[in-house]
């Protein structure tokens, strides 16, 4: 199945974070645009999360340990790990969640596979 990122609708996750979702039978792919200074509150989820920083600088805190991520860096957040974040600059991030996030599926995006 084929799709173009420009054809995927965007939705607002929380203030300062907009995302486009691609859902498959096994995963959710989230293309996130975060505005500089936008804060992602502390949370956890049962899915493993892989975050790939495409543009910008992002401060990710996992289990109270802060990491400053830059373009090209990848970080794996284990299932159920408490984490939060802050966009230091405008950011473009690819997040991959396994298994699929039903809560994000309800927000929209497209289903492939």
Segments from the language model and where they lie:
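A short, N-terminal "cap"/entry segment at the start of jelly-roll beta-barrel domains
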Residues: 1-26, 109-113
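Structural motif
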Residues: 28, 57-59, 66, 82, ...
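Conserved short histidine dyad/triad with adjacent acidic residue
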Residues: 30-44
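Glycine- and acidic-residue-biased ligand/ion/polar-headgroup-sensing regions
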Residues: 48-58, 63
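A cytosolic small-molecule/anion-sensing beta-strand core signal
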Residues: 54-55, 70-71, 89
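Ligand-binding loop in jelly-roll beta-barrel domains
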Residues: 79-103
